Amino acid sequence: MAELVSVAILGYLLGSIPVGFLMGKLRGIDVRRYGSGATGGTNVLRTLGPWAALFTVLCDIGKGLLAAYLGERLAGEWGFVAAGLLASLGHSYPVWLRFRGGKSVATSGGVMLLHYPLAVLVGIAAGALAVVPTRWVSLGSLTASLAVVLQLFLLDAPLSHRLLVVALAVVIYVRHWENMKRIAAGTENRLGVKARPRA
């Protein structure tokens, strides 16, 4: 039990590293004051541009992957689950930023990348297919998440892994609740729209 608690804390701390926020600070910009207010790749793209967004996404993937690897290495199968889930939660709710972070898509993808790289790639492809006609990045994120969940159930993955991927999807969908309402209303921001200062 002590090992699980330790890797869960480690996962949270890794996940809570606010890469997007730090990228903005390097340029004197607080990304939380623009667009959606999130610190993840999409809002960084709209606020700081493509290169900052690419770096942010890669680092966010790396956080999840490293947390999952260390969790499994130190505490086995359930260590992978605990560290992976807490990395995702840490990204969305970082203590350093008063629990206002990103939306956990890239970090969750990094977690699942450890054991299911093909499923993650298929999820990315499914997400891209959703983005191309709509230009709604949020819809692509939701589609990708669901695609990975479905694949793990079709693959008959271990129960612990299926529980993890469902939990990660729940985090992603909760964090995208406002996006889903805007999608339903047809008012969601489309890819290419620059972030505006928040009121």
From Swiss-Prot:
GO terms for molecular function: acyl-phosphate glycerol-3-phosphate acyltransferase activity. This is Glycerol-3-phosphate acyltransferase. Signal peptide: none annotated. GO terms for cellular component: plasma membrane. Its EC number is 2.3.1.275. It is an enzyme of class 2 (transferase). Belongs to the PlsY family. Pathway: Lipid metabolism; phospholipid metabolism. It comes from the Bacteria. Coiled coil: none annotated. It is a multi-pass membrane protein. The gene is plsY. NCBIfam families: glycerol-3-phosphate 1-O-acyltransferase PlsY. It holds the Pfam family G3P_acyltransf.
